[in-house]
């Protein structure tokens, strides 16, 4: 089975969010599952810094049906720690911005890349069984396949899988881009890619992909409701028979407390005491009182409403008054950046506000914290809770999306479960969940030890996820005419 994974960002070549981690790790595990994957992404400016042994394999390729004279080149290297080839679509006009999701025209850029992918596969004679596209930026690929490439023998047996990593980002643009895309005008209607007088790239992907998945089973159900559907719930219900949820995994080689070079002290379940050495070392680094007994709550997040910061803001003072240390890392809305900075000024012994992105500090927080807070309004999958479980740091979450699929409320009688949480999006419920976790930490040591044991034994591997994706590829291939 030959699969092309197509994405705007792929770790370690270009990373903005969790999508890069997913598409960076999945090929390695698909390879182990006897799939023959390749990866295709744009050659962003940052790729030059992060890619080794980049070879130009073809140049000056044109796209006949696009309203542009721009041509593209193709570069190639290998995804690290694999035998998987990765191809880069290079065009100075569209992909020379400093950051991944920037450019002169984001709609044109996505259209150009989608069309260039299909031409790349043809000129290199890379015939694929499945094109696995990700998010709105690549959602027009299935649309092109079912329209302009419908009679193309090269793609006669090629099927598509669309993965929606976050329904909140849809690629909604002015209808003028229909002309640039070269797509037939009949697509511009309510049953096509038209969306409230504009065009919606993700809607096109949902309607024209053979199979669709989101990054957790719960989120796949949630987005078919009005509350979470972002005005696409009707379209998603229309495709519900072809809509699945597959939890992301995490790379166990990359995120391993026994070998992670980014943390202070390596540890495992066999010497869990060393976890507390990480706490004391982090306390020292951040200027907090050095005491392994003080419960430390970590939070690594974008500082935006979606992550539950509106309800956290209502009870942050109460949480800090529980005599804990609260370590936050992230950037985002100015009001939340200021909130945490002020909290640190007011409670310097209890709050460490790190308003930045620092991957090494992130790992130290995962390893050093006792608890990890994720009170998200919605969370398609969430990786933070997975990393925290892997490092024996107990998650406190709102049960939504992937958080509901990975964190199981601890049952004191059965000694099952790996965390704590709440359902109703309400600050008092958040406070109650934090209080429950702190009670177990301070007063129920046997249960806390069991919680850490359960957390670190939770299967969050990519092996599990890769097997699920192979099932979806087979479902898509069964739709071949």
From Swiss-Prot:
Q: Which domain of life is it from?
A: Bacteria
Catalytic class of the enzyme: transferase
List ligand-binding residues for ADP-alpha-D-glucose: 15
Reaction catalysed? [(1->4)-alpha-D-glucosyl](n) + ADP-alpha-D-glucose = [(1->4)-alpha-D-glucosyl](n+1) + ADP + H(+)
One biological-process term from Gene Ontology? glycogen biosynthetic process
- One Gene Ontology MF term: alpha-1,4-glucan glucosyltransferase (UDP-glucose donor) activity
Q: Which InterPro entries match?
A: Glyco_trans_1, GS/SS, Starch_synth_cat_dom
The pathway where this protein functions is: Glycan biosynthesis; glycogen biosynthesis
Enzyme Commission number(s): 2.4.1.21
A Pfam cross-reference name: Glyco_transf_5
| This protein's UniProt keywords | Glycogen biosynthesis, Glycosyltransferase, Transferase
**What protein family does this chain belong to?**
Belongs to the glycosyltransferase 1 family. Bacterial/plant glycogen synthase subfamily.
Function of the molecule: Synthesizes alpha-1,4-glucan chains using ADP-glucose.
Q: What is this protein called?
A: Glycogen synthase
The gene it comes from is glgA
């Amino acid at each position: 089975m030959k699969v092309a994974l197509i994405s705007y960002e792929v770790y370690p070549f270009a990373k903005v969010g969790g999508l890069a981690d997913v598409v960076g790790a999945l090929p390695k595990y698909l390879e182990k599952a006897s799939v023959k994957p390749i990866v295709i992404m744009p050659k962003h400016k940052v790729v030059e810094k992060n890619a080794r042994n980049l070879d130009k394999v073809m140049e000056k390729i044109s796209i006949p049906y696009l309203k542009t004279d721009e041509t593209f080149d193709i570069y190639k290297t290998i995804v690290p720690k694999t035998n998987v080839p990765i191809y880069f679509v290079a065009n100075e006009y569209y992909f020379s911005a400093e950051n991944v999701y920037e450019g002169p025209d984001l709609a044109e850029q996505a259209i150009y890349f989608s069309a260039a992918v299909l031409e790349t596969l043809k000129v290199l004679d890379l015939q694929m069984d499945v094109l696995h596209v990700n998010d709105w930026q690549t959602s027009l690929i299935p649309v092109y396949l079912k329209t302009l490439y419908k009679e193309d023998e090269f793609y006669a047996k090629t099927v598509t899988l669309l993965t929606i990593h976050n329904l909140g980002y849809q690629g909604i643009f002015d209808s003028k881009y229909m002309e640039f895309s070269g797509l037939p005008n009949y697509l511009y209607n309510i049953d096509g890619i038209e969306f409230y007088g504009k065009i919606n790239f993700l809607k096109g992907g949902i309607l024209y992909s053979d199979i669709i998945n989101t990054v957790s089973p719960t989120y796949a159900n949630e987005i078919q409701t009005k509350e979470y559907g972002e005005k696409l719930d009707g379209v998603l219900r229309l495709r519900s028979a072809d809509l699945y949820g597959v939890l992301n995994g995490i790379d166990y080689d990359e995120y391993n407390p026994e070998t992670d070079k980014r943390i202070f002290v390596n540890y495992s379940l066999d010497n869990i005491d060393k976890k507390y050495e990480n706490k004391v070392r982090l306390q020292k680094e951040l200027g907090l009182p050095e005491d392994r007994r003080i419960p430390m709550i970590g939070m690594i997040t974008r500082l935006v409403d979606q992550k539950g910061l509106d309800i956290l803001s209502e009870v942050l003072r109460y949480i800090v008054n529980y005599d804990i240390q609260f370590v936050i890392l992230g950037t985002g809305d100015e009001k939340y950046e200021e909130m945490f900075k002020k909290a640190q000024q007011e409670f310097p012994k209890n709050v460490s506000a790190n308003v930045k992105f620092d991957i090494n500090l992130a790992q130290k927080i995962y390893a050093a914290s006792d608890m990890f807070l994720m009170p998200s309004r919605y969370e398609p999958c969430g990786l933070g809770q997975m990393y925290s479980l892997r490092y024996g740091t107990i998650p406190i979450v709102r049960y939504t999306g992937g958080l509901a699929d990975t964190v199981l409320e601890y049952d004191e009688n059965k000694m099952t479960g790996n965390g704590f949480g709440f359902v109703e999006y309400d600050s008092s419920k958040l406070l109650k969940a934090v209080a429950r976790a702190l009670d177990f930490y301070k007063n129920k040591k046997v249960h806390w030890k069991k919680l850490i044991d359960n957390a670190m034994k939770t299967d969050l591997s990519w092996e599990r996820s890769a097997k699920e994706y192979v099932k979806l590829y087979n479902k898509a291939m069964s739709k071949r005419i």
